[in-house]
A protein has these predicted regions:
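C-terminal regulatory/oligomerization modules of transcriptional regulators
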Residues: 1, 125-149
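Short alpha-helical elements of helix-turn-helix
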Residues: 8-9, 33-43, 66
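Short capping segments at the starts of secondary-structure elements
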Residues: 48-53
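Charged, amphipathic alpha-helical coiled-coil/dimerization segments
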Residues: 73-133
Length: 149
């Protein structure tokens, strides 16, 4: 008898396939140099309601300081963001999107939204609702078991 499929394995597989599909869509639209993390950081900065510093990126995404430094240096070199000295504390550098960074964010989001729409076109509203309900149930259970948030 065949062993029952693992939900965790299926989630990992779907995640990999979706990320690969989005990367392919982005590359076809000319955004092949945008990494997933660059995209997340662009979005974080774009939607920020307050000044953002490197420490915010480190804590929000759970990334080491040295890694964030390298990512931000590359993003600054590509012209997506600037680091300016905070007017209240010269030790801190405020991160701000450039006009290019804003444009890249909006353009990549349009490509990603279109890719999501195409991927989800095969499921009904009810299937989508049930999927979210089941995933949320699994998340809450894992958090309960592991003591996570």
């Amino acid at each position: 008898m065949e062993k029952e499929k693992s939900i965790c394995f299926s989630l990992k597989r779907v995640n990999h396939i979706v990320e690969r599909g989005i990367h392919t869509s982005l590359a076809a639209a000319g955004f092949d140099e945008i990494t997933n993390m660059h995209g997340w950081i662009l979005g974080f900065l774009y939607h920020a309601q307050r000044p953002v510093y490197q420490k915010d990126i480190e804590s929000n995404f759970g990334i080491a300081r040295s890694t964030v430094t390298n990512i931000l240096q590359l993003m600054e070199k590509k012209g997506y963001l600037t680091r300016t000295t905070d007017e209240h504390d010269a030790r801190f550098k405020r991160l701000e999107l450039t006009e290019l960074g804003k444009k890249v964010h909006l353009d990549t989001i349009a490509v990603i939204d279109s890719a999501h729409d195409n991927m989800e076109a095969v499921i009904t509203y009810e299937e989508r609702r049930i999927c979210f309900e089941v995933l949320e149930k699994i998340c809450k259970n894992v958090e309960k078991i592991t003591g996570g948030e």
